[in-house]
């Protein structure tokens, strides 16, 4: 299992923009304008699959299935 890295919103943006530079699993705490959301990025294959979650448990479960 890959280790999940906690990153800032700016770091997450860079990972999504240049996915082949940062292979791995990432989690970021961000705001969608009204709520705080967890942004999870499965970049284990360099494809930067991204999902938003309102629960840490759900975000971790999604990343750990990678």
Where are these regions (language model features)?
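Short amphipathic beta-strand/extended segments with alternating polar/hydrophobic composition
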Residues: 39, 50-56
